[in-house]
From Swiss-Prot:
Ranges where the Helicase ATP-binding domain occurs: 154-335
Keywords, alphabetical: ATP-binding, Helicase, Hydrolase, Nucleotide-binding, Nucleus, Ribosome biogenesis, RNA-binding, rRNA processing
The organism of origin for this protein: Eremothecium gossypii (strain ATCC 10895 / CBS 109.51 / FGSC 9923 / NRRL Y-1056) (Yeast)
Chain ranges passing through the membrane: none
Protein name as catalogued: ATP-dependent RNA helicase ROK1
GO terms for cellular component: nucleolus; small-subunit processome
RNA-binding recorded as keyword: yes
Length: 569
């Protein structure tokens, strides 16, 4: 098909300079021998735009029986309900085809009786009778072809199997668990049982994002007695309403929450999770580490349905976390796309040696001068104090910048994220609070101002760029103090297919002692304050502060002495 002819259709002008009157019906021209007619051309265009092959083939009016054409006022909705979709055959039908598809995206699937992957979203209609309204919402949101993790995870989930899934950042993991979750809730015939699906996220920002995506796919979907499918984010206000019994927990089909808030509401007996059949842990490596593992255990205890399906998704999957996760599952299927410790291959990764802390500020200003600082940019630091300090330093460079961290209120964080997404902010300085799952469109550059504390943290940080098939760049600054901490990052770069210089190869080799130091967090040191103030000025300020404090102490001592003299007198 000539795409230029299609794009210019309706834009032609008559040779005499007069515009074509498109309000009149044009007479149908007869196609020359060897050429397609207009109807054939339109039919081919329709077929190419019908991604999911859901369009019904309706005969032309001239070819219909007389009694069929005579009923001009027939209700279209009745026609839709009466007609049956003829779904196309699935693209993947044999184990050999599945193996070939998996080789194309380096996918590894292990587990008893793992189902074949899907080759397209059309396969969901053929193999699993995907709900028409859910399919329509997918089309409206421009989801036309499944990503590798979606090809594998969706059919496994639709067979109610437990999953441990690992795929690179920005590879479509959210959709991989939302599509089967919504389909299973729609298919569930149980009425008035309460929450059926539960999604756990380690951060509020990620929970918000999942809620937005789930709400888009759940639009205009009705369950029993024309009740709309209800998705809720367990916010502070909703938690208060549940505690005060202003709303019933039976009202919601799917709830998305962070662990601590969910445990709090469950312990108050305001939310019953005994009917949950589909439990999803997003960013499972974080939820199963020592920070959240107790809360995760409490959630698993509250979800007591005998036929519950557990699904775990993450961009990184350490062996310790995987062992713990598999211990709570029944006959799970393990899905790995690429390497479980590798970063997204669309990201160009760089290491920059800065010598010391002062050199980092020089390096970031050099990036700005050389034109490598192309907005939008995210800069990660290891602490709130350092994030604030860098924010004040970059304000002097007249950058359109803001900072986000755990000390900001939820409203402030949401406003900053909205401004960054809309382009009002060019640069966002943050801690690891934004390192996981948040999908910012078109991030060009990620800067690790401080070396991440683990290979997993590094993969999640740089995963804010290179999402959805786009290219991105990640730059990591390191100093002499980071000699050990930078070694896991070099290994991630090698596994991701990045070019690694000879000097990097040498520092990448870790001894057993160094591995233990990194695991225990002893490879990381206390860093100096971020500042360009000269040392002599800092010393003067410190001396001035000491003088003021000494003066205050003398005054207090004098006042205490005067008071004791008055008492004796």
């Amino acid at each position: 098909m000539d795409i230029f002819r299609v794009l210019t259709r309706g834009a032609s002008v008559k040779k005499d300079g007069k515009q074509v009157d498109f309000s009149r019906v044009q007479s149908q021209r007869t196609a020359r021998p060897g050429q397609r007619g207009k109807d054939e051309d339109e039919e081919q265009l329709s077929r190419e735009l019908d991604f999911f092959r859901t369009r019904r083939s309706v005969p032309a009016a001239a070819e219909r029986p007389a009694e069929e054409t005579g009923d001009a006022h027939r209700d279209e909705t009745e026609q839709d309900e009466g007609a049956e979709d003829v779904a196309p055959p699935p693209r993947i039908t044999t184990a050999e085809e599945a193996s070939q598809l998996r080789r194309s995206y380096r996918g590894k699937v292990t587990g008893a009786d793992a189902p074949l992957p899907i080759g397209s979203f059309e396969d969901l209609v053929t193999r699993f009778k995907l709900d028409k309204r859910l399919l329509s919402n997918l089309i409206e949101n421009n989801f036309t072809e499944p990503t590798p993790i979606q090809c594998e995870a969706i059919p496994i989930s639709l067979q109610n199997r437990d999953i441990v899934a690992c795929a690179p950042t920005g590879s479509g993991k959210t959709l991989a668990f939302l599509i089967p979750l919504l389909q299973q809730v729609i298919s569930d015939k149980a009425v008035g049982t309460g929450v059926k699906g539960l999604i756990i996220s380690p951060t509020k920002e990620l929970a918000n994002q999942i809620f937005d995506e789930c709400s888009k796919l759940a639009q205009r979907i009705f369950l029993e007695k024309k009740r709309p499918l209800s998705v809720a984010l367990l916010s502070k206000s909703l938690a208060a309403k549940l505690k005060n019994q202003i709303v019933s927990d039976k009202k919601y089909d799917i709830i998305i929450s962070t662990p601590l808030r969910l445990i709090d509401i469950v312990k108050s007996e305001s939310l019953d999770l005994s009917a949950v059949k589909y439990l999803i842990f997003d960013e499972a490596d974080k939820l199963f580490d020592k920070t959240f593992v107790e809360q995760t255990d409490d959630i698993l205890s509250a979800c007591s349905h005998p036929n519950i399906s557990k699904v775990l998704f993450s961009a990184t999957l350490p062996s310790s976390v995987e062992e713990l996760a598999q211990s709570i599952m029944t006959d799970p299927v393990r899905v790995i796309i690429g390497h479980k410790e590798a970063a997204n291959t669309n990201i160009e990764q760089k290491l920059v040696f800065c010598g010391n802390e002062e050199g980092k500020l020089v390096a970031i200003r050099q990036l700005i001068q050389e034109g490598m600082f192309r907005p939008p940019v995210i800069i990660f630091l290891e602490s709130i104090t350092r994030a604030k300090a860098l924010f004040h330093e970059l304000l002097y460079d007249k950058l359109n910048v803001d900072v986000i961290h755990a000390e900001r209120t939820q409203v402030q964080r949401e406003k900053i994220i909205e401004r960054f997404k809309s382009g009002d902010l060019w640069c966002l300085i943050c801690t690891d609070v934004l390192a996981r799952g948040i999908d910012f469109k078109g991030i060009n550059l990620v800067i690790n101002y401080d070396v991440p504390r683990s290979a997993q943290a590094y993969v999640h940080r740089i995963g804010r760029t290179g999402r959805g098939g786009r290219k991105g760049t990640a730059v990591t600054f390191f100093t002499k103090q980071d000699a050990i901490a930078v070694k896991p990052i070099v290994n991630v770069m090698k596994q991701s297919g990045c070019e690694v210089a000879a000097w990097m190869e040498n520092i990448a080799k870790m001894t057993k002692r160094e591995k233990e130091m990194i695991k225990k967090g002893k490879a990381f040191v206390d860093r100096k304050q971020i500042s360009t103030v000269p040392k002599i000025l800092k010393q003067k300020k410190r001396q001035q502060k000491e003088m003021i404090e000494a003066s205050k102490k003398r005054k207090l001592a004098q006042q205490a002495g005067d008071a004791s003299e008055e008492e004796h007198a």
